[in-house]
Amino acid sequence: WSPFVKWDGENLVGKSWENVRILGVLQRIALCYFFASVIVFYGKTKGAYFVGMVILLLYWFACYALGADGDPYSLQGWFGNPIDIDILGVNHIYKGEGVPFDPEGFMSTPAAIVQVIFGFLVGQYIQLKGKNTDMLSGLLVAGLVLTFTGYCWDLVFPINKKIWTSSYTIYTTGLAILTIGV
């Protein structure tokens, strides 16, 4: 499989660009690492943490305020769909959910950027503390706090991987930190 060519039985034939999906997992990872590195480089540790928290809260506000009345956190009601479609075009959006929706679209990427920032902060913490039980204890506590916070936030902002909600970011970051700590 390739997004640009296909095998017709005898030759490689170029595919039409009309329906090529532009964003995917690897593109999202690249965007997240780029923006997270810029935030960390210019904001340093405290600034990166602050920017990350602001992004998660603003994303929550945007999902609620700009989403469809009654169901702003569903695929159909999520505010990012029309924006991603306007930017990318409906032919370049993933359609596997029954509605044109891109799980790696531009509008759900900010919360994923914060997850990369958290990864940096955890790595920095591990380097600072060194390999010892205090470091592991700190990771376990942080992991439990974040997992619990994400779980509680789910009551008002559902954990939803498809739109990469802020509660999903906090919850899964907590689980990842717990895994590292174990």
What are these language model-derived features?
Residues 1-182:
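Alpha-helical transmembrane segments and their immediate juxtamembrane cytosolic regions
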